[in-house]
Design a protein with these regions (language model features):
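Beta-strand-dominated extracellular/periplasmic modules and repeats
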Residues: 1-127, 131-160
Length: 160
């Protein structure tokens, strides 16, 4: 997962802390309060942190998380694969929290959290773009690009 943190004018937000946390490939978080019966992956920590560079770029090497049932809802609906992200930086007053979703996942259309964002274009800004991993061809995997805009009309939805 890679991308850039940008301001409302498309300029990089340099030296911001980007933090991620996510479920493992089976859809389970590595903490004691996750009651999903999927297996724990002992080799997966579930999160990471990095600083944006001079161009506002960030990058994480991780796995695609699995879907999981949302336990606190009467119908136990399933959350689509997603990665939680937070951004800390000098240009804004508080921690910004959002989620990154994967393209073409059928659960995106029925996810109560993603669908709580009323503007369809804003929801699209929460869905990453699939890109080749040109810098790591030996992995034979794909990457996902997700740019985060911290304010303005094209702002990434936060607080979801």
């Amino acid at each position: 997962v890679s991308g850039r943190v940008l301001d409302e004018n498309g300029k990089p937000v340099r030296h911001s802390l980007v933090e991620i946390w996510q479920a493992n490939a089976a859809g389970r978080y590595p903490h004691k309060n996750d009651n999903h019966d999927a297996p724990i992956d002992p080799n997966f920590t579930g999160g990471g942190r990095t600083m944006t560079d001079e161009h506002g770029r960030y990058q994480f090497l991780t796995i695609k998380p699995g879907a999981y049932p949302y336990p606190n809802h009467p119908t136990r609906w399933w959350r689509p694969p997603h990665i939680h992200m937070s951004i800390f930086g000098d240009g804004f007053m508080s921690r910004l929290v959002t989620q990154m979703f994967f393209p073409a996942d059928p659960l995106n259309d029925v996810d109560l959290i993603l669908q709580s964002v009323p503007d369809a274009r804003a929801r699209e800004r929460m869905i990453a773009r699939q890109v080749p991993m040109a810098d790591m061809p030996m992995l034979n995997e794909v990457g996902f690009e997700h740019n985060i805009v911290v304010r303005g009309q094209r702002q990434t939805p936060f607080g979801v």
